Amino acid sequence: MKYKDLRDFIHSLEQRGELRRITQPVSPALEMTELCDRVLRAGGPALLFDAPDGYRFPVLGNLFGTPRRVALGMGVDADDNATLASLRDIGRLLSALKEPDPPKSLKDAGKLLSLAKAVWDMGPKTVSAPPCQEIVWEGDDVDLHKLPIQTCWPGDAGPLLTWGLTVTRGPNKTRQNLGIYRQQLIGRNKLIMRWLAHRGGALDFREFALKHPGQPYPVAVVLGADPATALGAVTPVPDTLSEYQFAGLLRGARTELAKCLTPGVDTLQVPARAEIVLEGFIHPQQGAPAPAPEGAPPRPTAGAAAGYEHALEGPYGDHTGYYNEQEWFPVFTVERITMRRDAIYHSTYTGKPPDEPAVLGVALNEVFVPLLQKQFSEITDFYLPPEGCSYRMAIVQMKKSYAGHAKRVMFGVWSFLRQFMYTKFIVVVDEDVNVRDWKEVIWAITTRVDPARDTVLVENTPIDYLDFASPVAGLGSKMGLDATNKWPGETQREWGRPIEMDAAVKARVDRLWTEIGLS
């Protein structure tokens, strides 16, 4: 089933028993987090808080709290058993878009042309009088405190906007970038835009600051987009394809867009049926900035982007299960807020796995597999355990062909997608080991690994800024474990032969099993 907007998706989830309305008053400060966390850990439904304490906007939480709801959001109507396989089909689509196979026949050429036509046909279209601009706040009416922005954890620095799709464009690009970056509320119309240096929004901003120093940088933030667009923003879409086009492919209908209303931001387009849109700028720093608080990291001084307004962000509880350190990020000044009538505020929380980002990671893991297999045909399976904070550990299953092959795969994974830049640990196993079963993975590590021979350590590599275990923020080491059977040249000893029961005996016991009454 395809969904034209968030409300359509909510209605469908409610009919399926996948969404529960909460009519009792619940505070966005801590209480929603506790409720959502308990429900998510139990595999429960999405929650729509109809009466958030002190606010008039309903709050939607846990929307993608199960892999099945992620698949439904991508337009795949599958039962729980078929969900992961359906997500791999989406990965195959992305793989074909990223690197099409050369056609081997007229039939293959026809398929390639059909795919190209489908992508072309799904180019977004601009509409007039969009629902997302039914209500407009301008001037003194712009007040972010009117929105039920969650404060998720007791030690958080303040309310945090979490599910905003940030729309940016670089100075030399026609394609808009969609990214999800958390944003700390620091004033009536001020948010801190926490985008890490390698993310698309930060790259667009730096390029703009270099080409147009001292000019305000336009930004739009979308709250409550349709599920295909929201999930497109967290999917590794090829650079040649916009997230809006990919959302159209998932939805089976072109994404309808609206031009922003604010002069200077009207170069950006947002989903026409979004619930709430924030329009504004990152402004150049006016005058000398205030000195950094005692004990805080120094203000950024290098690069053209350093000349823009920055503020100290955090600390916040994060997907690691810890509060992160404070750091400087640009300030986003909101000039205008547009919304639908009876708008819904979409939110989430992050914390020790499992949380909603971890569930998204489990689902997107299946999208990654065909992409990896396209580049590395020897990879037979791939798993990012949610306990590893979504991406910090990867287990790779491969068909090994020569000595040293596992190490080649490690370095290939680390360098393939931006999403794997921050993967600290990679364990490589053979085809006989189920990468989703910790018992089998631990067995392979403890029986097939010599720590000195089979451990790869790489120093001074990019690492997640939130990883406080690294000695320097943003720079740390990586470790690979070769837990495959060793080939000649990798060991001088006779390798162990796995124990396996005789097939005829197993068949005999299968027949006896029921007779004995053990089943």
From Swiss-Prot:
Cofactor(s) needed for function: prenylated FMN; Mn(2+)
Pathway terms, separated by semicolons: Cofactor biosynthesis; ubiquinone biosynthesis
Q: What is this protein called?
A: 3-octaprenyl-4-hydroxybenzoate carboxy-lyase
GO terms (molecular function) for this protein are: 3-octaprenyl-4-hydroxybenzoate carboxy-lyase activity; metal ion binding
What does the record list as GO biological process?
ubiquinone biosynthetic process
Q: Which organism is it from?
A: Burkholderia thailandensis (strain ATCC 700388 / DSM 13276 / CCUG 48851 / CIP 106301 / E264)
Q: Main subcellular localization, coarse class?
A: membrane
What EC number(s) are associated with this protein in UniProt? 4.1.1.98
Instruction: Report the subcellular localization.
Output: Cell membrane
Q: Give GO cellular component annotations, separated by semicolons.
A: cytosol; plasma membrane
